């Protein structure tokens, strides 16, 4: 009626844009009805799970069609919310001694892994900003969820743990990681603020260097795009590396389930590959063990030399054999290396950890 009235009186629509949406159905796709007893009240969800979980669910659905809502669906959404919240907690927890004014590392001096993380952040940032402009909130939801659970939790932060926990507090390696984490944190909290507004505000108030920022995340601008992070060469290189790591991760999980190993750091792996895969492996030979989260890693360019029980990629172009590493375990970093006990002042630790302990005056 408002459309007809406005057109008749003013000759134009009373709004710039209009969105259409479907109905909210129950978990089985049936129309909600009090007589049937399948009505899910939003206030009940908010009371049980919190407003941010409700808002996150709303952002996750494609509202242009009918959407389903049930306690089971919301419970699943609360698990997703918890993963996002835990990502924020982990980032904040590892920035306790980081001052962005004095400790930040220049982009060109950062570790390549950290620059890859910023590349992924930039891609997610652009996806989310466009999704908001297009009112496609479910695109924003999936981009953030995937970034937190896959790019950060399963890859970046998993590899980063060793650097964060074993390196000297003010080392370049650790500060490089913290610089990337700080950029990720301050960007991500603004990207999700329109949806999980209460959680975003909670994170904002806990940020390092908080006094120099807007008093509320909801008063801050969205993060600006940064073309420098969009490194196509780096993207292609890490696409190949992560594909290989995925094969190793599956092989390690299979070995763990078969009780061949207990923890990945108990493993010694040999990766068999040729052609382009072999070139990728050789380019990262020095950091391969750390990248795959194992104690020792070897490379073979002869696929036919792989043992029969070696784990093979789906296309058979990469094979991984896993054995228990018999080297002594460093009590500080848990890696099994040949240089454990090499420093008489620091027993039962590897040479790297002994060096760090010496630098720390211990």
Can you say where each PLM-predicted feature lies in the sequence?
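Short linker/helix segments within small regulatory modules
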Residues: 339-348
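Catalytic adenosine-cofactor/nucleotide-binding cores of aminoacyl-tRNA synthetases and other
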Residues: 23-28, 32-110, 208-213, 258-263, ...
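Acidic, turn-prone loop/beta-hairpin segments
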Residues: 98-126, 157-251, 255-275, 279, ...
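Short cysteine-rich clusters marking metal-coordination/redox-active sites
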Residues: 330, 350-353
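Metal-dependent nuclease catalytic cores in nucleic-acid-processing enzymes
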Residues: 1-11, 250, 255
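Short alpha-helical scaffolding segments that buttress acidic/His motifs in well-ordered protein cores
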Residues: 2, 18, 53-60, 85-91, ...
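Cys/His-rich metal-chelating microdomains
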Residues: 336-339, 356
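Core structural elements
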Residues: 79-92, 112-124, 142-164
């Amino acid at each position: 009626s408002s459309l007809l009235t406005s057109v008749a009186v003013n000759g134009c629509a009373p709004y710039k844009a209009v969105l259409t949406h479907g109905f909210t159905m129950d978990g089985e796709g049936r129309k909600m009805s009090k007589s049937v007893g399948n009505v899910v009240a939003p206030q009940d969800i908010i009371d049980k799970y919190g407003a941010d979980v409700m808002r996150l669910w709303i952002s996750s659905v494609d509202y242009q069609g009918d959407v389903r809502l049930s306690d089971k669906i919301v419970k699943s959404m609360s698990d997703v919310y918890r993963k996002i919240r835990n990502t924020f907690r982990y980032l904040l927890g590892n920035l306790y001694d980081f001052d962005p004014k004095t400790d930040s590392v220049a982009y060109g001096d950062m570790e390549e892994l950290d620059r890859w993380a910023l590349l992924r952040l930039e891609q997610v940032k652009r996806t989310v900003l466009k999704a908001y402009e297009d009112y496609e909130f479910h695109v924003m939801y999936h981009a953030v969820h995937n970034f937190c659970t896959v790019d950060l939790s399963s890859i970046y932060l998993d590899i980063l743990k060793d650097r964060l926990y074993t390196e000297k507090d003010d080392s370049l390696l650790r500060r490089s990681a913290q610089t990337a984490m700080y950029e990720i944190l301050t960007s991500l909290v603004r990207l999700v603020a329109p949806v999980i507004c209460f959680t975003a505000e909670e994170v904002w108030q806990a940020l390092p260097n908080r006094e120099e920022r807007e008093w509320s995340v909801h008063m801050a601008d969205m993060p600006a795009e940064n073309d420098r992070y969009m490194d196509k060469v780096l993207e292609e290189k890490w696409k190949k590396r992560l594909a290989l790591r995925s094969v190793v991760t599956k092989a390690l999980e299979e070995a763990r389930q078969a009780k061949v190993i207990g923890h990945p750091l108990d493993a010694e792996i040999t990766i068999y590959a040729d052609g382009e895969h072999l070139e990728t492996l050789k380019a990262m030979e020095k950091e391969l063990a750390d990248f795959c989260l194992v104690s020792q890693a070897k490379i073979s360019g002869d696929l036919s030399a792989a043992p029969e029980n070696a784990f093979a990629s789906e296309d058979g172009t990469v094979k991984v054999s896993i054995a228990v590493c018999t080297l002594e375990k460093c009590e500080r970093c848990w890696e099994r290396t040949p240089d454990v006990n090499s420093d008489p002042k620091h027993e039962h630790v590897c040479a790297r950890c002994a060096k760090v302990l010496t630098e720390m005056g211990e």
